[in-house]
Amino acid sequence: MMSPNGSLKFASQAVAKPYFVFALILFVGQILFGLIMGLQYVVGDFLFPAIPFNVARMVHTNLLIVWLLFGFMGAAYYLVPEESDCELYSPKLAWILFWVFAAAGVLTILGYLLVPYAGLARLTGNELWPTMGREFLEQPTISKAGIVIVALGFLFNVGMTVLRGRKTAISMVLMTGLIGLALLFLFSFYNPENLTRDKFYWWWVVHLWVEGVWELIMGAILAFVLVKITGVDREVIEKWLYVIIAMALISGIIGTGHHYFWIGVPGYWLWLGSVFSALEPLPFFAMVLFAFNTINRRRRRDYPNRAVALWAMGTTVMAFLGAGVWGFMHTLAPVNYYTHGTQLTAAHGHMAFYGAYAMIVMTIISYAMPRLRGIGEAMDNRSQVLEMWGFWLMTVAMVFITLFLSAAGVLQVWLQRMPADGAAMTFMATQDQLAIFYWLREGAGVVFLIGLVAYLLSFRRGKAAA
């Protein structure tokens, strides 16, 4: 059924709006805690003991994961009805799951901030099924169980929509990615006492999310947006999508081995990890060719929302640079021996997450939000200009954050890792030498926040395009 305002093809697509709005609120929180962390690198007692560095980092990374999950869920609720050519199976269930997930997320973050972590573990019964205390998987066991319940309800809702409607390559790839995301998260409940075994399966969640099934989600969202804004034949875009997804899975699954270099597994992982992870830039490069070829050479219509085309091209370029180029720079075992755990890792992580996943969520929000607000295909020119200012401020700021962290990482390797043990500078002494880069990174982070505010204001002030 067409929505009352005529901007949405199906009324149930409107349930995507709260997911997008809450995702952006959490995104702001993530950036604020990133700025707190960045300042704590150079002013060690900033906000101590109220917000220690380890707590700020935990909140920063957890907010990243949760806001992206909200973004993916909103994207699915928006595009699956349109791809399936039918209403969402249960908008009511989508609303219930939104409030459950939002409440669980807020309570978990408040728990990090207000209760000592050991106390939080006791309070939530972690001793009954110990899963806490691992990087990125710090959530209490009860929160992890809540995520599983929300994921099952979500998959049921979108899965039933797909089953009773039209089947397309885009919806099938998206569903494959979402199901894989949920299944791989189950390994967060496996916490063996053996540290090597723990790390081996820990990466099945962390790596196979961000360098595996999340790439399927990114590819499906990008393909959907390009179909809508270019008018290119769906068959052409679907062929590109199949090639990209095949390359992502072939390189990404065995490429997990580049995380196994130094955790105590057999030596053959040095070869497997190096060879296959060296192939991981290929799907991201293919996405660049895909987006630019589709938008610039096969255009059949002048889509009025210029900002969404900018986001669609930008996400592929930044993903290729961050996940592809910066990932390749330190993925080979002989190089990773020196760079592992340095600021080069942080440089890669920042640009890769922003380019591949933050930007693809902002792409679908840029496309969908005018319709969700009842405006139509695009907002007025002033709002689009403001949004594009937000794009450039955030993107250029992230490039400089990456460059400053890369410079810090190279110097860290030179001072701390390359010299023989007796001549190597200690960790803390090395950090003092990197302070200038941390200050520069903090400044770039402030610019990033300004860009994010501009992006948000573009929707608040937007009116229909003339």
From Swiss-Prot:
It is an enzyme of class 1 (oxidoreductase). Fe cation binds at H207, H258, H259. InterPro entries: Cyt_c_oxase-like_su1_dom, Cyt_c_oxase-like_su1_sf, Cyt_C_Oxase_1, Cyt_c_Oxase_su1_BS. It is found in: Cell membrane. It is a multi-pass membrane protein. Heme b 2; high-spin binds at H348. One of its GO terms (biological process) is respiratory electron transport chain. Pathway: Nitrogen metabolism; nitrate reduction (denitrification); dinitrogen from nitrate: step 3/4. The keyword Transport applies. Disulfide bonds: none annotated. Its EC number is 1.7.2.5. The keyword Ribosomal protein does not apply. Component of the anaerobic respiratory chain that transforms nitrate to dinitrogen (denitrification). NorB is the catalytic subunit of the enzyme complex. Shows proton pump activity across the membrane in denitrifying bacterial cells. The mononitrogen reduction is probably coupled to electron transport phosphorylation. Belongs to the heme-copper respiratory oxidase family. This is Nitric oxide reductase subunit B. It comes from Pseudomonas aeruginosa (strain ATCC 15692 / DSM 22644 / CIP 104116 / JCM 14847 / LMG 12228 / 1C / PRS 101 / PAO1).
